[in-house]
């Protein structure tokens, strides 16, 4: 009865807040958290077909974030007015055509407001919270329902980069010590080719004029930071355009920076007809430099196209964002050159991707052939930043900007950005898989992805795992349900409802922990049904999943060598990050 009373209390508080616009008391979040502990129910299938059931009354959203999202959709349905209806879990204002419901759902998923693959039970997904976020980001009245203003916003052409709330800038940037390079690939035929290039150059100057950056145009055959090209529908990066209208363009964050423009649009200059190339390009280059979308409607980084602006000027919001990353203008200016850059990328400390002038990010070779080149030395350090088994049972080891696919007789390698798409930083700290979702951790944020999604919502770790520190070292999820996060010599155990149960030393929680792991681990992964692998200093150790007992390998040793046993292609090529230097400019 006590639990029933708590449920009724919270439902009443939500009803009052929703209908009468009365703010919840300060104690409400803790009460709602307690309710989610009592009522959350989920049965997830892990990578090996095992299930971990718990009992309860309410079902969370598919990404398992609903306990932070406010009202449950079943409560919303009971409080709609006579001028509203509920269609497939979405509250719809009278006069808005029901066809907009599916458009809204697709939009919310595509741009990061709801988890991917949202074909779960309609009551599982809190569309009201997602709509409120969407309306806030679009700068329209926040009602939480599909009203006329929301339907109009859905039909407005926009940028294809997901909306990441509420953050303004990326944690990954270009260096200010040398120009950011750009080159031209395929261009639109809507304008004279020289005019296209002039509009692009003008778009770069927008950011050059107010920041500590400079830009250099280089031939398309050279190593380049930002490659500009036009294409239609499937244009080679795995993120297809949608024809005229809808998504106009998209760009990749540093250190992949490329900007792609939908050639199905009619690109124009200096006119209100068509789509203004200069303004869209300047917006996309904001992403290429590390800016996310802005909620300020007058800002260039507002996600929706607002038409041609004759006397365009950057908004103060845009200026503040770019200067927070790169400082103010030093007067270096944007230059154009037809010569190869004199600074070779491999001899600098610049945190960018490797040479990819003639490759496409979405195309990753995942098999090893006799003609495949030797792996880069940096990929052969023997140490991994993270190791993850994804929802398709593929195991990837991440090391700097590279990955190794380990679930093959002869492991293959490639760039992390090629395999996982844009929106995921390359400085990954840890990763694990739960059900259909793969989680990635970097600094104080987590990102998630499924097999059908390439975009990555960026969320503070403490929104989901309260009490978890930033910059974790490793993580794995037990087949029994708990998730173990590692930070220095400590391990944080969270239950299946993502509540912290215990913080203790690694040597205290597991049995017969090798002394080499007492001070911390580099990566952890559930390798198969029986064993968890722990990586540290070029070696890996194994522990039984159910008994949490470290055991020796058949040769009697407590560890196995990573290069000898896991990535033999690296024999003779091992090189630590610190000593990599500029040994091979092609890498």
From Swiss-Prot:
Pfam families: Hemopexin, Peptidase_M10, PG_binding_1. Disulfide bonds join 380-582. GO terms for molecular function: metalloendopeptidase activity; zinc ion binding. Zn(2+) binds at residues 159, 283, 287, 293. The record marks 324-325 as: Cleavage. Its EC number is 3.4.24.12. Residues 334-371 have a biased composition (Low complexity). GO terms for cellular component: extracellular matrix. A motif (Cysteine switch) lies at residues 157-164. Residues 19-166 form a propeptide. Belongs to the peptidase M10A family. Allows the sea urchin to digest the protective envelope derived from the egg extracellular matrix; thus allowing the sea urchin to swim freely. This is Hatching enzyme.
């Amino acid at each position: 009865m006590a639990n029933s009373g708590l449920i009724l209390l919270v439902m009443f508080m939500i009803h009052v807040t929703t209908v009468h616009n009365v703010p919840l008391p300060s104690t409400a979040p803790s009460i709602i958290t307690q309710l989610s502990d009592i009522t959350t129910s989920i049965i997830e299938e892990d990578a090996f077909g095992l299930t971990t059931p718990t009992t309860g009354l309410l079902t969370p959203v598919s990404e398992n974030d609903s306990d932070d999202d406010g009202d449950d959709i079943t409560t919303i349905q009971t409080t709609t007015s006579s001028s509203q209806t509920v269609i497939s879990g979405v509250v719809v204002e009278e006069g808005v055509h029901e066809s907009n419901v599916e458009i809204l759902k697709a939009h919310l998923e595509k741009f990061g407001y709801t988890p991917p693959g949202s074909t779960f039970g309609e009551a599982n997904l809190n569309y009201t919270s997602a709509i409120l976020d969407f309306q806030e980001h679009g700068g329209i009245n926040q009602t939480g329902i599909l009203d006329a203003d929301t339907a109009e916003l859905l039909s407005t052409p926009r940028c294809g980069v997901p909306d990441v709330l509420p953050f303004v800038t990326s944690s990954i940037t270009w260096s200010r010590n040398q120009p950011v390079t750009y080159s031209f690939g395929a261009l639109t035929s809507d304008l004279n080719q020289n005019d296209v290039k002039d509009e692009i150059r003008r778009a770069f100057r927008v950011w050059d004029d107010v920041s500590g950056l400079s830009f250099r145009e280089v031939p398309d055959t050279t190593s380049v930071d930002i490659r500009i090209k036009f294409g239609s529908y499937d244009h080679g990066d795995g993120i297809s355009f949608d024809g005229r209208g809808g998504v106009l363009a998209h760009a990749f964050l540093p250190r992949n920076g490329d900007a792609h423009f939908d050639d199905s649009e009619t690109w124009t200059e200096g006119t209100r007809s068509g789509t203004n190339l200069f303004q869209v390009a300047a917006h996309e280059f904001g992403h290429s430099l590390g800016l996310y979308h802005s909620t300020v409607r007058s800002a260039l980084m507002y996600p929706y196209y607002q038409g041609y602006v004759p006397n365009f000027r950057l908004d103060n919001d845009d200026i503040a964002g770019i200067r927070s990353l790169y400082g103010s203008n030093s007067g270096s200016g944007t230059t154009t050159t037809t010569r190869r850059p004199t600074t070779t990328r491999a001899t600098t400390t610049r945190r960018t991707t490797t040479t990819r002038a003639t490759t496409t990010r979405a195309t990753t070779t995942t098999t090893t052939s006799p003609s495949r080149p030797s792996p880069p030395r940096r990929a052969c350090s023997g140490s991994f930043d993270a190791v993850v088994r994804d929802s398709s049972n593929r195991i990837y080891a991440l090391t700097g900007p590279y990955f190794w696919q380990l679930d093959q007789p002869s492991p293959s390698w490639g760039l992390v950005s090629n395999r996982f798409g844009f929106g995921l930083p390359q400085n990954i700290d840890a990763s694990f898989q739960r059900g259909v979702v793969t989680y990635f951790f970097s600094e104080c944020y987590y990102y998630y992805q499924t097999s059908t999604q390439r975009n990555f919502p960026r969320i503070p770790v403490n929104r989901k795992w309260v009490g978890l520190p930033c910059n974790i070292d490793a993580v794995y999820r037990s087949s029994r349900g708990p998730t173990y996060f590692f930070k220095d010599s400590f391990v944080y155990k969270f239950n299946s409802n993502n509540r912290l149960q215990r913080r203790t030393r690694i040597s205290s929680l597991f049995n017969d922990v090798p002394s080499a792991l007492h001070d911390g681990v580099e990566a952890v992964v559930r390798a198969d049904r029986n064993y968890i692998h722990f990586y540290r200093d070029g070696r890996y150790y194994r522990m039984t999943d159910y008994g949490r007992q470290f055991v020796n390998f058949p040769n009697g040793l407590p560890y196995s060598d990573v290069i000898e046993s896991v990535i033999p292609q690296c024999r003779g090529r091992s090189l630590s990050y610190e000593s990599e230097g500029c040994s091979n400019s092609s890498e």
